[in-house]
Amino acid sequence: MSKTAIITGSAGGLGKGIAERLANDGFNIVLQDINEALLLETEKEFKEKGYQAVAFKSDVSKKKEQEELVQFAVTEFGQLDVMVNNAGVDAVTPILEIGEEELSKLFNINVFGTLFGIQAAANQFIKQKSKGKIINACSIAGHESYEVLGTYSATKHSVRSFTQTAAKELADKGITVNAYCPGVAKTEMWDRIDEEMVKLDDSLEIGDAFEAFSSEIKLGRYQEPSDVANLVSFLASNDSDYITGQSILTDGGLVYR
């Protein structure tokens, strides 16, 4: 029987790239996003390519909806094998201007969403009496905090912490928990970060901030979705069975830990 993977935030961007790679690896795919129009478009595209894929619209920041997402996957495909907690949002704000609304939004989605995904998946793995893999979206910002990305960095440090804690607590149940830490990729998220940095610095033009970050990458190019998807594919495979609690950098040589 084919294995089943849930990928949250997979209507576009890195999440879509991860979902497509896992589909090519032979997984049944459960696409999740809050953007219903884009989600259904991606589901249609995947089915046209012959992938076993279904879509589920939900809000990852709601514990009940994360549980419903997992139950949907089990109803559709019989069981769950891999949970990729990919959904996340960013914010570009100087430290003295960070407010309650920003904190609430980013922590609800990036941190609460990840934790609720860990819980829902782990409970299902335990119910199935099967080993399982939980893979979280961290970031270079989970290893090093960045100016005007304070809230985002704080949420990703939290994801790294929950990844370690979950790995320690769930190891005796055969469940591994790891995270992937992307760097600078040409995605809508990075486009937004670039645009917001321009607003904060009159000397910058659109693209300058992205190029400044990219110029520090030792391998000489910005990240493609496939770079992240390749790592997630490994973490979802049996080849990673002896790895847990790690937040692995995939950034082309930008942050060294």
UniProtKB/Swiss-Prot annotation:
Binding-site positions, NAD(+): 6-30
UniProt keywords, alphabetically: NAD, Oxidoreductase
Reactions this protein catalyses: (S)-acetoin + NAD(+) = diacetyl + NADH + H(+)
Leader sequence residues: none
Active site: Y152 (proton acceptor), K156
InterPro entries linked: 23BDH (IPR014007), NAD(P)-bd_dom_sf (IPR036291), Sc_DH/Rdtase_CS (IPR020904), SDR_fam (IPR002347)
Entry's EC annotation: 1.1.1.304
Name of the top EC class for this enzyme: oxidoreductase
Residues that, per the record, bind substrate: S139
GO molecular function, one term: diacetyl reductase ((S)-acetoin forming) (NAD+) activity
Record-stated family: Belongs to the short-chain dehydrogenases/reductases (SDR) family.
Role: Catalyzes the irreversible reduction of 2,3-butanediol to (S)-acetoin in the presence of NADH.
Protein name as catalogued: Diacetyl reductase [(S)-acetoin forming]
The organism of origin for this protein: Staphylococcus epidermidis (strain ATCC 35984 / DSM 28319 / BCRC 17069 / CCUG 31568 / BM 3577 / RP62A)
